[in-house]
Amino acid sequence: YERYKQATNSDEITFSEFLSQYLTFTDETTTLAIQKNLLSVMKIYSEFVVSETYSSIRPGQSYVVSDTALCTGSAVIYDMCASEGGYTYIVTNYHVVYLEEADEALNGASKIARKIYGYLYGSESTPAASVNVSTNTVQKDENGYTKYDYGESAIALEYIGGSVSSDIAVLRAKTSDILAVNPCAAQVELADSYHVGETAIAIGNPEAQGISVTQGIVSVESDYISLNIDGSSRSYRSIRIDTALYSGNSGGGLFNAAGKLIGITNAGNSSDENINYAVPLEIVRGVADNIIYYHEKGYDAQCAYKIVLGIIVQTQNSKYVYDAGSGYGQIREEVVLDSVASDSIAESMNLQSGDIITAIIVNDTEYEIARSFDISDLILTLREGDVIQCVVQRNAQTVYSEEYTLSKTALVAIE
């Protein structure tokens, strides 16, 4: 782009216009992008203790058998610290490392996996029950549970936090441990945006058969699905794709044709073909950065944090707006305050029922609110000490709310 401006001695064309006019993606460039992405993906195995109750041959009696169980999924290398002693952060789905059926009392007082291992592409192995060669019997650990051998290429991963309501979990490993397996391992690149019709490439571990690639398109930018991960049904905002996904793809990366991450694949529709889902990049980035930030700050709740504004919103005048200059369009809507809770942050900012929120200013940077979920996405990025202010339309006038400085006491843990 810089060379183009120098050659033409012109600044009239924007970078996005330059891309749309002069940069095209062929099958070859997409293949090259996928090849690079293979340095940033992992397959995951999570180990739990589960207990099953069996009926005894004696009437009215039963007995319980406890043993290890393995679940598999996928992940992406999200952030690598190359400094000595640094950590690499890895993102997957919460449901890849959480098992509702786990025996909490025997699984380390948690339903999060007691052990998590990852494998880089090209260095993959499959865990197997350890066998005592001399007796030809399965080895047991100190608790009497089946012991698994994960192989030399397995990388031990530590769970540092997650959000069941976003279906995102963050793991970490010493960067040196990852580079010892593959010195070329790299973190993913994040896309700036994604659009309906855009190429959607999934890289994951379908059916635990090893890392593989499928390709489709983005069908719907923002859809809602219901998932039951921990015994409670929740609604999840998702990207709908027609890219083929299978069990084991969960937690894997969804990439565009340029090889940049646009989401984390997490669900499929078993009854309908070509309808699958991914956690949108805004949520992936918001939750992951949030968890990493507060983990490094010493917060020990293993979760993300947010503020509660104390508002209920409604939307109106939703429409699709096409930009001929960029060649892209988006759905836009008016976000109207339906109610403001007493003694809330919103009330202290002097927001009122009927206000139309058009933007939120964070530390002097203005962020447009074009959809209702833009508010919750932005809230994930807020940190203690940030100063926020709302821009609203009130009685056909543009009004700036009072400023509010986020305190530590305003933060609440996200499920």
Named regions from a protein language model:
Residues 148, 156-158, 292-305, 349, ...:
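PDZ-domain C-terminal substructure recognizer with occasional recognition of PDZ-binding tails
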Residues 74, 80-85, 184-186, 243-248, ...:
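PDZ/PDZ-like domain segments forming the peptide/carboxylate-binding groove
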Residues 80-166:
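Catalytic-histidine neighborhood of serine endopeptidases
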Residues 106-113, 273-276, 281-282, 359-391:
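PDZ domains, with a preference for the canonical peptide-binding region formed by the helix
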Residues 94-113, 178-185, 203-216, 225-251, ...:
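Active-site loop architecture of trypsin-fold serine endopeptidases
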Residues 65, 160-166, 221-239, 295, ...:
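Gly/Ser-enriched beta-turn/beta-hairpin loop segments
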Residues 113-116, 128-131, 261-329, 411:
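C-terminal cap/linker of serine protease catalytic domains
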Residues 24-31, 51, 57-91, 154-158, ...:
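A conserved glycine-rich beta-strand in the N-terminal activation segment of trypsin-fold
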